[in-house]
Amino acid sequence: MSDFLNYLNSNLTPGQAGAYLWVVIYILIIFAAVSVAVIAMNWLERKILAHMQVRLGPMRVGPHGLLQPFADALKLLLKEDIIPANADKLVFWMAPLVVVITAFTTYIVIPFGPTHAVTDMNIGILFMLGVASLGTLGIIMAGWASNSHYPLLGSLRSSAQMVSYEVAMGMAVVSAVLMTSLSGVGVYGIGPGGGDAIGTLSMIEIVRAQMNQHVWFIFKFFPLGLAAFGIFAIAMVAETNRAPFDLPEAESELTAGFHTEYSGFRWSLFFLAEYAAMIA
C-alpha cells in the first residue's frame, strides 16, 4: 500500500490528484444515492403490493415501516453465507460481483444535469448498452457455478431474454441519436440550424439539446418519440427480469431462478444490482 501511495505522490501533480479525488467522491455520492433509491423503491413496492392485496405491508419497524428495508439489509449481512459443496467456488464468488459492478458502471455516463456526470464520453450510449449487456455474463456464471439444474435453467432463460430485448432497446436508444440530428445537434456542439449535424452519442449533449429547446424529444417528435419511449420502457422491464417478464424466476418451476443457491450478502448483491439497473 505504501508503494502505491509513493507512486501516486511522485507521478501526480496537485491538479491531477484533485481531479481524481473529485471523481472518486462523485462516484461515492452516486453509489450512496442509488443505494438509498433502491431502499426507497423496495419499500414503496412492498407497500403498493400490500395495498393491492388489501394488506398494510411493513408497519412495525419505523413509522409505516420506513426502516424495514434497513432491517432487512442488516439481516442479510448477518446471515450465514452458504456455498454449495459441489459448486465452482471461484465462479460462484465472482458472479454477483460481475452483476453488481456492471449495474453501477452504467452510471458513469448517465448525466444528472447539464454538466453533472462522472465523465462525458462521446460514445456514452454505446458504452451504457455495452456495459449493461455484460450483466448477462454474471447471470450465466451464477447459474453454471451453482452446479444445480434450477439455477442453470434460470440463467439460460434470463440470458436468452436479455439478449433478445437488447435489440429492441438498442433501436429505441438509437432513435434519440436521430432526434438530436433532426434538432440540429452535431458531434462538436449544439446550435439551431446545425447544417450537416449527424447527431451525437454523448448523453450529456443529448440532455443539453433538449434543455436548449425547452422540450423533451418525447413530445417534440410525437408520436414517434412516445413510441420509442414505450419500446424502451418495455425492453427495460424485460432486461431487468421484472414482472410480467420474470420467467427466469418462475417460482412454480425454478424457485428463485439463477440465484437459488445464493444467500446472505451475495444474494443481496443480486438484489441491489436488479434495482440499480431498473433505476438506470
Identify the function of each model-found stretch.
Residues 1-280:
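Selective transmembrane helix interface/packing segments
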